[in-house]
Amino acid sequence: KRRAEVAKVLSQIPVARALGAGCMGSETTNMAKQPGVTRKEAQEALLRSLGEILPACEEQGVLFAVECVYYHAMNTPEAVRMVLDTMASPNLRVICDFANYVGPEAASVDAQRRIWDKVGSWYGDKITAIHFKGQNFQPDGTLYSTSLEDSCVDYAGGFEMLRQMPQASLPVLREEAVPARAASDLAFMRRFAY
């Protein structure tokens, strides 16, 4: 299955180049889809996949961005830094989805500020795009989607970190959008985006 997914990515690199997209991106694999696999093993598989993908990206002049998700193989700022350091590719970048860094144990603003500090100081200059969505947690820790206003995500702290990065601008992509909420989403997002 991993080889098939790598083959899909490899087949799309020339397409990205032809379109002038310049960057492709992917989350890493959800641990629930890898029963019996440890996080270390999942990260090793990710590194093997990137070892096949990144040389093709470098050859074609296309960036490839990975996205941290707290319940995936690459699940923490430490894991992102390990991947970036291990691969050491000039074409490897990061998609920053603030919500995906926040698990139930890190939902407090203080915990999130510690995450944003790590992201900014360790690899903030590698961020190539921002994903923006709302989420929160049930008392038992179950994740659920919310409006942006009802989210537990510390957007203020996240965007404060981004404003200190060297990028002149970053695309901000609204995920899980509800068309009827477009106007309120846009107003909410404009409070933070730069």
Regions found by a protein language model. Give the residues of each.
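Histidine-acidic metal/acid-base catalytic patches
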Residues: 22, 77-194
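Active-site acidic/histidine proton-transfer and metal-coordination neighborhood
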Residues: 1-94
